[in-house]
Amino acid sequence: MKQTILIFLISFLFSSYSYAFEGQVILITDGDTITVVNNGKPEKIRLYGIDTPESKQAFGNQAKNFTYSMVYHKSINVEPVTTDRYGLTVGIVNVNEKCLNSELIDKGFAWVYDRYCKKDMCDKWRLLEKEARQSKAGLWSQDNPVAPWMYRRNRNK
């Protein structure tokens, strides 16, 4: 019985573990959502731990354009973290030894999404956000930027 439980636990751990993969970016939906060709199939990826302005928000297009300039038609590495409620892979995206997630924060095009950002790197990202705020980079040049989750909440009322 103990052996059966042990085998089950080991197989469960390995089945839920997601491996990093390489792919080419074919579409930029917005600043924090891209589509990558993975094993010949398109896969939508949501960037882990961050939230960029919505398309109709101030700096929404700039965030999308920044993401486009960093990854469009480039080979990237995706480190899956989880799957969201819509079935999208949520992950960390690296291109040319740079992390897209952290670059968006550093340039002032994204908030750290504290509700979901729980990995160790999130502490570093919070410091990057603080520095971007202090230097008034990107969206932080506005007097009162509205976080995307607040924008969505208010829009849906």
Each language-model region and where it sits:
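Small beta-barrel nucleic-acid-binding modules, primarily SNase/OB-fold domains
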Residues: 2-157
